[in-house]
Protein backbone atom coordinates (compact mmCIF):
# COMPACT_ATOMS: atom_id res chain seq x y z
CA UNK A 1 0.00 0.00 0.00
CA UNK A 2 1.34 3.42 -0.96
CA UNK A 3 0.52 6.32 1.34
CA UNK A 4 1.10 9.74 -0.16
CA UNK A 5 1.46 13.11 1.53
CA UNK A 6 -1.46 15.46 0.90
CA UNK A 7 0.31 17.56 -1.76
CA UNK A 8 1.56 14.51 -3.64
CA UNK A 9 -1.86 12.84 -3.42
CA UNK A 10 -3.57 15.93 -4.85
CA UNK A 11 -1.03 16.22 -7.68
CA UNK A 12 -1.23 12.52 -8.60
CA UNK A 13 -5.02 12.42 -8.35
CA UNK A 14 -5.91 15.68 -10.13
CA UNK A 15 -2.78 16.69 -12.07
CA UNK A 16 -4.01 15.16 -15.34
CA UNK A 17 -7.42 16.86 -15.32
CA UNK A 18 -8.14 18.73 -18.55
CA UNK A 19 -10.15 21.74 -17.43
CA UNK A 20 -9.56 24.02 -20.42
CA UNK A 21 -6.66 25.91 -18.83
CA UNK A 22 -3.66 24.66 -16.86
CA UNK A 23 -4.33 27.32 -14.19
CA UNK A 24 -7.65 25.62 -13.44
CA UNK A 25 -5.89 22.31 -12.92
CA UNK A 26 -3.43 24.00 -10.54
CA UNK A 27 -6.36 25.59 -8.70
CA UNK A 28 -8.09 22.20 -8.40
CA UNK A 29 -4.91 20.64 -6.98
CA UNK A 30 -4.61 23.46 -4.42
CA UNK A 31 -8.28 23.12 -3.50
CA UNK A 32 -7.89 19.34 -3.09
CA UNK A 33 -4.92 19.90 -0.75
CA UNK A 34 -6.98 22.33 1.32
CA UNK A 35 -10.02 20.05 1.41
CA UNK A 36 -7.90 17.06 2.46
CA UNK A 37 -6.40 19.10 5.29
CA UNK A 38 -9.89 20.05 6.59
CA UNK A 39 -12.33 17.41 5.32
CA UNK A 40 -14.92 18.38 7.91
CA UNK A 41 -15.10 22.02 6.79
CA UNK A 42 -17.17 23.85 4.23
CA UNK A 43 -15.42 25.48 1.27
CA UNK A 44 -14.99 28.79 3.17
CA UNK A 45 -13.56 26.86 6.15
CA UNK A 46 -11.20 24.79 4.00
CA UNK A 47 -9.70 27.58 1.94
CA UNK A 48 -6.93 29.72 3.40
CA UNK A 49 -8.32 33.11 2.41
CA UNK A 50 -11.42 34.78 1.03
CA UNK A 51 -9.59 35.03 -2.31
CA UNK A 52 -9.02 31.25 -2.32
CA UNK A 53 -12.69 30.70 -1.52
CA UNK A 54 -13.84 32.96 -4.35
CA UNK A 55 -11.38 31.25 -6.72
CA UNK A 56 -12.83 27.86 -5.75
CA UNK A 57 -16.36 29.02 -6.52
CA UNK A 58 -15.21 30.54 -9.83
CA UNK A 59 -13.53 27.24 -10.70
CA UNK A 60 -16.72 25.27 -10.02
CA UNK A 61 -18.69 27.74 -12.15
CA UNK A 62 -16.62 27.04 -15.32
CA UNK A 63 -18.31 25.00 -18.06
CA UNK A 64 -15.11 22.95 -18.60
CA UNK A 65 -14.97 21.94 -14.93
CA UNK A 66 -17.25 18.92 -14.67
CA UNK A 67 -17.54 15.99 -12.31
CA UNK A 68 -16.67 13.63 -15.18
CA UNK A 69 -13.46 15.49 -15.98
CA UNK A 70 -12.40 15.74 -12.33
CA UNK A 71 -12.77 11.97 -11.75
CA UNK A 72 -11.48 10.90 -15.21
CA UNK A 73 -7.77 10.65 -14.25
CA UNK A 74 -8.59 8.63 -11.12
CA UNK A 75 -10.73 6.22 -13.15
CA UNK A 76 -7.95 5.86 -15.74
CA UNK A 77 -5.39 5.15 -12.99
CA UNK A 78 -7.67 2.49 -11.52
CA UNK A 79 -8.21 0.85 -14.93
CA UNK A 80 -4.47 0.93 -15.66
CA UNK A 81 -3.77 -0.98 -12.45
CA UNK A 82 -5.68 -3.97 -13.90
CA UNK A 83 -4.42 -6.15 -16.73
CA UNK A 84 -6.89 -6.88 -19.56
CA UNK A 85 -8.91 -9.97 -18.76
CA UNK A 86 -8.30 -9.75 -15.02
CA UNK A 87 -11.36 -9.98 -12.82
CA UNK A 88 -11.28 -7.81 -9.73
CA UNK A 89 -13.72 -7.78 -6.86
CA UNK A 90 -14.27 -4.46 -5.13
CA UNK A 91 -15.76 -5.05 -1.73
CA UNK A 92 -17.08 -1.91 -0.09
CA UNK A 93 -18.90 -0.90 3.04
CA UNK A 94 -20.36 2.25 4.48
CA UNK A 95 -20.36 2.43 8.26
CA UNK A 96 -21.97 5.07 10.42
CA UNK A 97 -19.74 5.91 13.39
CA UNK A 98 -21.94 7.54 16.04
CA UNK A 99 -20.48 9.06 19.21
CA UNK A 100 -23.88 9.87 20.71
CA UNK A 101 -25.58 13.20 21.11
CA UNK A 102 -23.52 14.50 24.04
CA UNK A 103 -20.09 14.10 22.44
CA UNK A 104 -18.54 17.45 21.47
CA UNK A 105 -15.67 17.03 19.04
CA UNK A 106 -14.65 18.87 15.90
CA UNK A 107 -15.41 17.29 12.57
CA UNK A 108 -18.51 15.40 13.64
CA UNK A 109 -21.85 15.88 11.94
CA UNK A 110 -25.40 14.67 12.43
CA UNK A 111 -25.97 10.93 12.14
CA UNK A 112 -28.97 8.64 12.25
CA UNK A 113 -32.14 10.67 12.42
CA UNK A 114 -30.12 13.75 13.34
CA UNK A 115 -29.92 13.12 17.07
CA UNK A 116 -26.42 11.62 17.10
CA UNK A 117 -23.00 13.07 16.31
CA UNK A 118 -20.45 11.21 14.22
CA UNK A 119 -19.39 10.51 10.65
CA UNK A 120 -19.77 8.08 7.77
CA UNK A 121 -16.81 5.89 6.81
CA UNK A 122 -16.78 4.37 3.32
CA UNK A 123 -14.04 1.84 2.67
CA UNK A 124 -13.23 -0.32 -0.35
CA UNK A 125 -10.96 -3.32 -0.80
CA UNK A 126 -9.99 -4.64 -4.24
CA UNK A 127 -9.17 -8.34 -4.54
CA UNK A 128 -7.97 -10.39 -7.47
CA UNK A 129 -10.78 -12.88 -8.15
CA UNK A 130 -8.29 -15.60 -9.18
CA UNK A 131 -6.21 -15.71 -5.99
CA UNK A 132 -8.00 -13.40 -3.50
CA UNK A 133 -4.84 -11.29 -3.18
CA UNK A 134 -5.34 -7.68 -2.14
CA UNK A 135 -4.72 -5.15 -4.93
CA UNK A 136 -4.05 -1.43 -5.00
CA UNK A 137 -7.18 0.64 -5.76
CA UNK A 138 -6.34 3.54 -8.07
Pin down the residues of each PLM region.
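Conserved, well-structured functional cores that handle cations and Mg-NTP chemistry
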Residues: 1-138
Amino acid sequence: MVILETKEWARVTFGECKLGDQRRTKRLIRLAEQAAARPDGSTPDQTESWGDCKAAYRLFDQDDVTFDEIVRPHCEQTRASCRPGDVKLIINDTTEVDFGCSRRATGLGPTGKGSGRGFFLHSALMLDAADAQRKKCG
